[in-house]
């Protein structure tokens, strides 16, 4: 694949999302340093425009805003941990009238409310008297589903300082935005997207996949294509399994998974070990074209590419 091709792919992705109204900004030459919902620093080369005002290469004072009825984001935790790292941050928990009748509010509910001008106005009016010396305001990543840039710009205009999102627990609203845009793009190109199906198995003839078999509502369906991409993840995503003896394999095409043979070697004694956890680095070995190969580098399936968490050496947690 190579760094150049990765850069080209990311540039194409940026063009796609720019034209779709949800820009991803950055380059592979330099990372943004963005705050997490724990107040830690998360490096990333590309990020939605809605998150960029939170870049921690700037030391502008921050106000971290949460909502009393939204229990998946704790502004004090974010602010305290940022303060401990030398940043200036205060927390603010809001009681907005539209939320007072709710004991618990979900991220989806909040995002839908932020899509309405009335809710944004009430939030801005609650923040302004308590803005103080803050030069930017951070929210949980719930600033609308349909038109996040419109929500962002409206809040910035009303509050008078830059606004940014901080991603947190699933369901991820930024992830839903990305998913929706990608689905629309695939469908506009003539593709089909199936939701609620589980791919169970495959049919392979002479080293080539002839179909994959999915199931939904107790009905199976065969899917035919010239080429297939495996993006089912590793052990965490259910794309790989292992038996009690330690033998690991991928679940759809029964591809061999490279993992420590001894189960006692799957984990390091320290959770935060610099080397990560060996079992989460387990995966499928591929050639330079991402086609799966066996331990002797011999090709296994000609019309299959493996990507993401299913790849050997990729550690989603480290």
Regions found by a protein language model. Give the residues of each.
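Residues forming the flavin
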Residues: 1-8, 15-318
């Amino acid at each position: 694949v190579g760094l150049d091709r990765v850069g080209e792919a990311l540039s194409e992705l940026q063009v796609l999302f720019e034209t779709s109204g949800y820009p991803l900004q950055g380059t592979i030459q330099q990372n943004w340093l963005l705050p997490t919902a724990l107040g830690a620093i998360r490096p990333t080369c590309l990020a939605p425009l809605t998150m960029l005002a939170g870049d921690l290469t700037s030391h502008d004072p921050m106000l971290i805003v949460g909502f009393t009825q939204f229990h998946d984001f704790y502004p004090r935790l974010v602010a305290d941990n940022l303060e401990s790292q030398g940043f200036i941050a205060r927390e603010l928990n809001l009681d907005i009238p539209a939320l007072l009748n709710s004991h618990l509010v979900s991220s989806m509910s909040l995002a839908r409310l932020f899509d309405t001008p009335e809710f944004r106005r009430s939030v801005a009016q609650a923040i302004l008297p308590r803005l103080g010396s803050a030069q930017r305001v951070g929210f949980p990543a719930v600033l609308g589903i349909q038109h996040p840039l419109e929500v962002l710009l409206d809040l910035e205009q009303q509050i008078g300082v830059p606004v940014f999102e901080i991603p947190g627990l699933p369901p991820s609203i930024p992830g839903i935005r990305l998913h929706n845009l990608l689905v629309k793009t695939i469908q506009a190109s003539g593709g089909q997207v199936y939701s609620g199906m589980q791919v169970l198995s495959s049919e392979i003839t002479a080293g080539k996949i002839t179909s994959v078999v999915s199931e939904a509502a107790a009905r199976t369906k065969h899917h035919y294509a010239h080429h297939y991409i495996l993006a089912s993840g590793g052990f965490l995503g259910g794309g790989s399994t292992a038996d009690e003896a330690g033998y690991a394999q991928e679940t759809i095409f029964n591809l061999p998974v490279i993992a420590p043979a001894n189960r006692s070697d799957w984990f390091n004694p320290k959770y935060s070990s610099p080397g990560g956890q060996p079992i989460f680095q387990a995966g499928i070995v591929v050639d330079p074209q991402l086609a799966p190969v066996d331990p002797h580098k011999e090709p296994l399936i000609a019309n299959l590419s493996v990507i993401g968490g299913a790849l050997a050496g990729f550690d989603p947690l480290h």
